[in-house]
Each structure stands twice: as structure tokens, then as C-alpha cells.
């Protein structure tokens, strides 16, 4: 088999060489026959001075936002890297004189506000996760220190503060509720890090609302609403701008899908961004409070779909119940315990929203405010029941346990 392959390679080389030589011989013969007849007509090739107007709606849009898009540099202690650095931070691993720290990863950010001597930058939480120090590289090449104003792991957003001394422009946000599938979408950021800062790629909006599941550093999964685009998104684009044809920010670039869940098939053109309306809502709260308070039930849970058939049978569920969240344990003193929920209960609805997984439960729960009362539908010993749960506690009151999701 090896000899056959080598033979094919050699044959290809020989045929290719024959074609090249033949072409040379034909050219030689032709030029000799034409001889002096063509010499008097020979002219040198010149570059044509043609003026082309390259200004388009796309170039104008990029120009409007380019000065407000920055690179975010995450420094950590040597041999300490963020769990997210290999996913979307553009891991560089280069050493730095930044207080003896190492540049662990780079992402992107968007300057959206100037106030006094400060400027505010929105980026993804996973871009800054695990940092010991942060720098922001401006479009003009100046590198400035950044401090964290606040962050929210659930939505994967963070707000940084920098000096406004060298800040030229700030971005404006569009109303993401007015987006239309098929309209132009342009991603601006730092793919693979600051070496390619302010890279722009163009595509369209493929979808205006997708549920995207994220895995946090503690292993818990969350589900967020996202814009889908086929504009090229690469490692390092995280936290950058997705803009419309007017140069307004319609989303903060967050992630992309590169393969199917089982890894068997590669995919292209599946990029996601957090919608601008959601971004504005979160960053305003982060500026004020530094964190986002969300209601908590006070349970540890596991998806019904993750149970073995033997474990599922012990729950005595009707055959019509194929999805839900199994209460693994209940935290004393929190809303679920107060309302009478117990380990082994299977939650199938929160309010009017059907629950088939823990991400469904979180999405439904987080649509409510602290101190709201919500009806929870569940099954116990095969029978359906409901409980009115007053959401008097927040996620900050939860005990964490990596063996199961908490809420």
C-alpha cells in the first residue's frame, strides 16, 4: 500500500512537470516566430490610477465603534489560569512585568460611558475570571489599569472602570427588541488577543432569540437568551461588540459553537451575543450595586433525564411526565423548605412556565423578583401537588455543592 501511494505521488509530479515544460516550449516557439514584429509594439505595464469610493454603510458603522472597542488583558499568578481561558480568552501564557504576574488570557471589551475622570467598559465575566490584575489596551495603543466594578456569572457580564484620559469615543446601544433576522451584523474585537485588535467581521443576524446553555466555573449550568450571528467569532472576541449597520451595539459577543455536542461534527457560523437590552439592564445594576441579586428556592437539584431508569422508577411518576427537576436536597430556612418541598419531589412547573431541566427552572425563577410569591408545581409519590413559595432569599444565601446544581 505504501509503494502504491508513493507511485501516485511521483506520477503526479511527472505529469505536472510535463505540462510546465510543454507550456514553456510553446511560448518559446511562438515568441521566436513573432520575432521583431512585436518588439516595436512592446510597452511596459503600469498601475492604473483609478479612484474608487470605498465608503459604505459597513465601513461607516465600523468607524463609529472602533475607538470604543478595547482588548482586556487578564493577569494571574504564574501557573494559575482561568478555567475559561482555553474556551474564549485567547490564552497567551506570556510572562509580564505586571507585578510579577503572567498574562493568562485576553478578550475584548466595549467602552460605553465616560463620567468625570473615569470610563466604563463592559466585557464578559469569563474574560476576567480568576484575575489578579487587569489591563485594558485602547484602540490608540495606550495600556491602562482596570478595576472591577461588578460582575454577574449568570449572564456572563462584567463592568470595568478605567481612566478616561485617552478615551476618544464611547459606544451607543441599539434597542435589541427591534432586531430583524437577516439584517447585517458586524463583530468587532480582538480575536486571538491584542495582536489582532479591532478586527471586524461581517455577517447577518441568524436569529434574535436563542437559549444558550453555559457552564460556570463551579460546574453549574445556566441558560441565557442570546442573539445568533454568522459573523466570524474567534477566541478573544469575547466581550467585544456586535453592531448593526448604524454602528450601534446590538450585543456583546459571548460564545460560539464549533462542534456538535458529541464532538463528531464541526460546525461554522454559529456565534452568539448577549442582546443589548439585557446588557444595559445588567450593567446599570452592576454600576450601582456591584452584583445582581436573584431569588433562590434553596434546593440542590438534578435533571430527571440524568437519572437511571431504576432511580426514575422509584419516583413513581406517571408515564406522561418525561421531564422535570428532581429535588436532591432542601436547605433549611430557605423558601423551598418553608413551603414544604422535600427531597425526592419532582418540579415540573414554576409559575406558568414548564420545567424540564435545571436551566428551565433557573430561567423561570430569575424572571421573578425577590419577595415575589410563585406557584411551584411538583410530583411527590406519583401525585401532582402545588406550593406557593415566597422568594424571600437570594442566591447569595445558597450553600454551594459541586455534586449538584443549586438554586
Curated annotation (Swiss-Prot):
EC number: 3.4.21.107
This protein's name: Serine protease Do-like HtrA
Residue stretches making up the PDZ domain: 301-382
UniProt GO BP: proteolysis
Main EC class the enzyme belongs to: hydrolase
Keywords recorded for this protein, A-Z: Cell membrane, Hydrolase, Membrane, Protease, Serine protease, Transmembrane, Transmembrane helix
Binding site for substrate: 236-238, 297-301
Principal place of residence: membrane
Catalytic center residues: 126 (charge relay system), 156 (charge relay system), 238 (charge relay system)
Membrane spanning stretches: 6-26
Organism of this sequence: Lactococcus lactis subsp. cremoris (strain MG1363)
Amino acid at each position: 500500500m505504501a509503494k502504491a501511494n508513493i507511485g501516485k505521488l511521483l506520477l503526479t509530479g511527472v505529469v505536472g512537470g510535463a505540462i510546465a515544460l510543454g507550456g514553456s516550449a510553446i511560448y518559446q516557439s511562438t515568441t521566436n516566430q513573432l520575432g521583431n514584429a512585436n518588439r516595436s509594439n512592446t510597452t511596459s505595464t503600469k498601475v492604473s490610477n483609478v479612484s474608487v469610493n470605498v465608503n459604505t454603510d459597513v465601513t461607516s458603522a465600523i468607524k463609529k465603534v472602533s475607538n470604543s472597542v478595547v482588548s482586556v488583558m487578564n493577569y494571574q499568578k504564574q501557573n494559575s489560569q482561568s478555567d475559561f481561558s482555553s474556551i474564549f480568552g485567547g490564552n497567551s501564557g506570556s510572562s509580564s512585568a505586571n507585578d510579577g504576574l503572567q498574562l493568562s488570557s485576553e478578550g475584548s471589551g466595549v467602552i460605553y460611558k465616560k463620567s468625570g475622570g473615569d470610563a466604563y467598559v463592559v466585557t464578559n465575566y469569563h474574560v476576567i475570571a480568576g484575575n489578579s490584575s487587569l489591563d485594558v489596551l485602547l484602540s490608540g495603543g495606550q495600556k491602562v489599569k482596570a478595576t472591577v466594578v461588578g460582575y454577574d456569572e449568570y449572564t456572563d457580564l462584567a463592568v470595568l472602570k478605567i481612566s478616561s484620559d485617552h478615551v476618544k469615543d464611547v459606544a451607543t446601544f441599539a434597542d435589541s427588541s427591534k432586531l430583524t433576522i437577516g439584517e447585517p451584523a458586524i463583530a468587532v474585537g480582538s480575536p486571538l488577543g491584542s495582536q489582532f485588535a479591532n478586527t471586524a467581521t461581517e455577517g447577518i443576524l441568524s436569529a434574535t432569540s436563542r437559549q444558550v446553555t453555559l457552564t460556570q466555573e463551579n460546574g453549574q449550568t445556566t441558560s441565557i437568551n442570546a442573539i445568533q450571528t454568522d459573523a466570524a467569532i474567534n477566541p478573544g472576541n469575547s466581550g467585544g461588540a456586535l453592531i448593526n449597520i448604524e454602528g450601534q451595539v446590538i450585543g456583546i459577543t459571548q460564545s460560539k459553537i464549533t462542534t456538535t455536542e458529541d464532538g463528531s461534527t464541526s460546525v461554522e457560523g454559529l456565534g452568539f451575543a448577549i442582546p443589548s437590552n439585557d446588557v444595559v439592564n445588567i450593567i446599570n445594576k452592576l454600576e450601582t450595586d456591584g452584583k445582581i441579586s436573584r431569588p433562590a428556592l434553596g434546593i440542590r437539584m438534578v435533571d430527571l433525564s440524568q437519572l437511571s431508569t431504576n432511580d426514575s422508577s422509584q419516583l413513581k411518576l406517571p408515564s406522561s411526565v418525561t421531564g422535570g427537576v428532581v429535588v436532591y436536597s432542601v436547605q433549611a430556612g430557605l423558601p423551598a423548605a418553608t413551603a414544604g418541598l422535600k427531597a425526592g419531589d419532582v418540579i415540573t412547573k414554576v409559575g406558568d412556565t414548564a420545567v424540564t431541566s435545571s436551566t428551565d427552572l433557573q430561567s423561570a425563577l430569575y424572571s421573578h423578583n425577590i419577595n415575589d410569591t410563585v406557584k411551584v408545581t411538583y410530583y411527590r409519590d406519583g401525585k401532582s401537588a402545588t406550593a406557593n413559595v415566597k422568594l424571600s432569599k437570594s442566591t447569595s444565601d445558597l450553600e454551594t455543592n459541586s455534586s449538584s446544581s443549586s438554586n
